[in-house]
Amino acid sequence: MARLLITGAGGQLGRSLAKLLVDNGRYEVLALDFSELDITNKDMVFSIIDSFKPNVIINAAAYTSVDQAELEVSSAYSVNVRGVQYLAEAAIRHNSAILHVSTDYVFDGYKSGKYKETDIIHPLCVYGKSKAEGERLLLTLSPKSIILRTSWTFGEYGNNFVKTMLRLAKNRDILGVVADQIGGPTYSGDIASVLIQIAEKIIVGETVKYGIYHFTGEPCVSWYDFAIAIFDEAVAQKVLENVPLVNAITTADYPTLAKRPANSCLDLTKIQQAFGIQPSDWQRALKNIRAYAE
């Protein structure tokens, strides 16, 4: 039986991965959270991978606190760069493939159209810079690596924009939401499904072109538009009785420690052509909004 190792299994994406793989039942799955596998601990990484000898490693472990990373630079780089290095070095010993999750924040957002995998990266913040360096290192070290860039992740688990909006709606009459940043909201369950589909192709020996791929939800919208859609669905499904007045504001109106790209829209042509994978439908995923409110 093929063996899959999931890192970061306690996080938003990791929990989605673990659930899908347990339901799948076709693989021997080792899903480890931070307490069980700290990817910044080289000895721990090598010990677990040497013992389990996974066919595929899905790395869902990451430092994702975008603003906090500006204050904790070394912590962000430790997880997003050094941790990735240790995984790659251990994987090489067993010819394990690595599927690694990255971010739209490797781009500066100045492009007018959607970003392709071949576009030059230019991150604006520490988080984006650390993820970009992790990408570079992984591609350098591991010939059997796939990097999946995604954006604006939401789902049942962890902290995300949908959960934040539903929480704020309970005690706010008015909300200001940024309208001059656009991107593709992406359901974490769909990201997990895509990673598993790719892992399965590797396991059965299909010819897979390793490298960078983009996968997000469509259509691209602003945070403001996404918030409106969330509240519309919440009211329709009686998750909320009343919703706040939502005002469109600019990035300048809502200063943050980390600078974010104005355009996070990613081109999905490559993954569609290579794997037949279609975009995530975030509007469909919002139909499950009751689960995000719990």
Curated annotation (Swiss-Prot):
Q: Mind telling me which GO cellular component terms the entry cites?
A: cytosol
Family, according to the entry, reads as follows: Belongs to the dTDP-4-dehydrorhamnose reductase family.
Record GO terms (molecular function): dTDP-4-dehydrorhamnose reductase activity; metal ion binding
Recorded name of the encoding gene: rmlD
Q: Which UniProt keywords apply?
A: Carbohydrate metabolism, Lipopolysaccharide biosynthesis, Magnesium, Metal-binding, NAD, NADP, Oxidoreductase
Q: What name goes with this protein? A: dTDP-4-dehydrorhamnose reductase
Task: Name the catalytic site residues.
Answer: Y127 (proton donor/acceptor)
Its annotated pathway reads: Carbohydrate biosynthesis; dTDP-L-rhamnose biosynthesis; Bacterial outer membrane biogenesis; LPS O-antigen biosynthesis
Subunit note? Homodimer.
Q: What does this protein do?
A: Involved in the biosynthesis of the dTDP-L-rhamnose which is an important component of lipopolysaccharide (LPS). Catalyzes the reduction of dTDP-6-deoxy-L-lyxo-4-hexulose to yield dTDP-L-rhamnose.
Instruction: List the catalysed reactions.
Output: dTDP-beta-L-rhamnose + NADP(+) = dTDP-4-dehydro-beta-L-rhamnose + NADPH + H(+)
Binding annotation for NADPH: Q12, L13, D38, I39, A62, Y63, T64, Y127, K131
Naturally occurring in which organism (per UniProt): Aggregatibacter actinomycetemcomitans (Actinobacillus actinomycetemcomitans)
Positions of dTDP-beta-L-rhamnose binding: T103, D104, W152
> Which Gene3D superfamilies does its entry note?
NAD(P)-binding Rossmann-like Domain, UDP-galactose 4-epimerase, domain 1
Q: What is its EC number?
A: 1.1.1.133
Name the positions where NADH binds. Answer: G11, Q12, L13, D38, I39, A62, Y63, T64, Y127, K131
Site entry (Could provide a fine-tuning to achieve optimal pKa matching between active site and substrate), positions? T103
Q: Cofactor note, please? A: Binds 1 Mg(2+) ion per monomer.
The Gene Ontology biological process terms listed for this entry are: dTDP-rhamnose biosynthetic process; O antigen biosynthetic process
| Names of the cofactor(s) | Mg(2+)
